[in-house]
Every structure is written in C-alpha cells, then in structure tokens.
Amino acid sequence: MTILKLDDIRFAYPGYAPVLEGASLQLEAGQRLSITGPNGAGKSTLFRIALGLQTPDAGTVTAFGQERRVEADFHEVRRRIGLVFQDPDDQLFCPTVAEDIAFGPLNLGRSKAEALATVEKVLTDLQLLHLRDRITHKLSGGEKRLVTLATVLAMEPEALLLDEPTNALDTKNEARLLEILSGLPQAILLVSHNPAFRAALAPDTVELRDGRLL
C-alpha cells in the first residue's frame, strides 16, 4: 500500500527564491527511506507539506490513496502519520510526561482510562516508565527526544516522519533511539545529517537538490 505520494511539489516562501521546484516522492507501507540534502534545501518544508501544515504553490499530496487538498483532508493524515519535529520543545507542551503522551489519545476520543493505559504501554515498551511523572521542561535534551517519540507512538501511526531525530542526543541515547526505531513496524521517512544513523535505520536514500528529489 502506498502511504504517501508527493507529485511535482513546488513551494516558495514569500519574497524568497523557490525551495521546492517539482519534488516528487513515494513512501510504501513498511518502507524506510532517508532524504539527504544541505541545510535550507527544503526537507522540513516537504514534511510539513506532506501533513498539510503548509500549502504547496503547486503539485499534489496523496495519502492512503486519496488526494489531500484542504485542511479537513489532512485530519486523517495527521492521525495516521506521525511527525517527530526537529526541536522537541515544539512538540512537548503539557506539564508532565504522562500528560504529554495522553494528549494524543484523548484528542482521538479515547477515554481517560484508555489514554492512561496507552501511556503505560508506550513508556513500558520504550523502557521509559521512570519518566512518567517527571516535569517535561526539566528533562534533558535526550530525554525530551525520546518522550517526543513516545507521544507520537501513542497515536498508533502507520508511518513516521523523523526530522533530525538525533539532535541533542548523546551517544547512549542515540543508540537507544536507533534500537527503538529499528524494532518498530511503521514505515519511516528520515531526515538526518548523521550518516551512520541513516545507514543503520533507513539506508535507501534520495537527495533533495535544487528543489527536486533525485
């Protein structure tokens, strides 16, 4: 099954040269794919367009077999494709770790009991149960990164978009993150400047250069 298909995506920020000039991409169920390219090439922009967080100037976004055009079209997409932002502080906004992780399931209409059960399961699966009642903003950068992943996995997505997931991670937490991600069943689209991490998790690579994916 094709999870995500981007066709001839074009995008420019107002007053600036085009960032994307005909970028096309396809992600299949279970596939793991890395996107490389220099800073400012448009990799993060491509992720945001894929989830309807930005609107392309031209081109089409198709997810789960349906073309997505307006905000309402992307509600389902954001339930089924999880995005791990480059900066964990953009994603963690509740007082405690448990509340951050429960937010997604509650937003999907789960009961409080169901959401709390999901918190326990996700933290147990990731061996992070010791962080459950911690104050989120007091976590280390590495802990925040792992909790951010937990918040996304609590939504039970079918694919993950990972934007520089090793940022702020020490060697130990990077190895732990790789171990966790390698054991997941989801399709993964990875942006990372870490060649060893890319090679281990998503060795198939496309390059974003001059606004196109090659």
Question: PLM ranges: what are they?
Answer:
Residues 59-69, 77:
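Conserved ABC transporter NBD signature motif
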Residues 160-163:
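Catalytic Walker B motif of ABC-type/P-loop ATPase nucleotide-binding domains
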Residues 1-6, 10-22, 71-73:
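A short, flexible loop at the N-terminus of ABC-type nucleotide-binding domains that lies
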Residues 51:
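Helix-to-loop junction immediately C-terminal to a conserved catalytic motif
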Residues 36-38:
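The feature captures the beta-strand-to-loop junction immediately N-terminal to the Walker
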Residues 135-139, 143:
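Conserved ABC ATPase signature
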Residues 113-131:
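Conserved ABC ATPase "signature" region
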